[in-house]
């Protein structure tokens, strides 16, 4: 089985949680609320939301911020959640014994959550130094407009 390599660009840090025991649909409901927000705002939102999926996502966001500050030396106040994705994991299957020797299948879904944090101050500095206004080229707009009067005849459909 091939493993997909993650392209870790400079300025981005991620945390990955695998085999979290909850439905991917329920985790996506929380992830959609925090995508694109700052780190501090995300922590406040996750503490106040009443869903069970908030706790593992809170731990992952906190872990990604710890990775950013320890490994890359980023400031936690300038972190933004650039990507947040939830994928379906394996499904645990059990049999529950029922009456008269029968059994029902019980499925426990799992999911994989990936949180990617981006340092917004790094990208602001990069854009400031790399982009100069003289390098931008403006395209000329096409302003020559010719109007054709169709009421006088002579069009394509008038020929017999």
From Swiss-Prot:
This is Large ribosomal subunit protein uL22c. Part of the 50S ribosomal subunit. It is found in: Plastid, Chloroplast. Keywords: Chloroplast, Plastid, Ribonucleoprotein, Ribosomal protein, RNA-binding, rRNA-binding. One of its GO terms (biological process) is translation. Gene3D superfamilies: Ribosomal protein L22/L17. It comes from the Eukaryota. Pfam families: Ribosomal_L22. This protein binds specifically to 23S rRNA. The globular domain of the protein is located near the polypeptide exit tunnel on the outside of the subunit, while an extended beta-hairpin is found that lines the wall of the exit tunnel in the center of the 70S ribosome. The keyword Cell inner membrane does not apply. InterPro entries: Ribosomal_uL22, Ribosomal_uL22_bac/chlpt-type, Ribosomal_uL22_bac/org-type, Ribosomal_uL22_CS, Ribosomal_uL22_sf. GO terms for molecular function: rRNA binding; structural constituent of ribosome. Belongs to the universal ribosomal protein uL22 family. Its main location: plastid. One of its GO terms (cellular component) is chloroplast. HAMAP family: Ribosomal_uL22_B.
């Amino acid at each position: 089985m091939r493993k997909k390599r993650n392209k870790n660009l400079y300025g981005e840090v991620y945390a990955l949680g695998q085999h979290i025991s909850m439905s991917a649909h329920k985790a996506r409901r929380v992830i959609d609320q925090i995508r694109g927000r700052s780190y501090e705002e995300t922590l406040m939102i996750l503490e106040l939301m009443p869903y069970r999926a908030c706790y593992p996502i809170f731990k992952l966001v906190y872990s990604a911020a710890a990775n950013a500050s320890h490994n890359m030396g980023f400031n936690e106040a300038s972190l933004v959640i650039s990507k947040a994705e939830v994928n379906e994991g394996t499904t645990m299957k059990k049999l529950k014994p029922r009456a008269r020797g029968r059994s029902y299948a019980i499925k426990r879904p799992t999911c994989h959550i990936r949180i990617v944090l981006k340092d917004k101050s790094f990208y602001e500095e990069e854009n400031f130094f790399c982009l100069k206004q003289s390098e931008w080229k403006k395209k000329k707009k096409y302003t020559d407009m010719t109007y054709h009067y169709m009421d006088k005849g002579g069009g394509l459909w008038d020929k017999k």
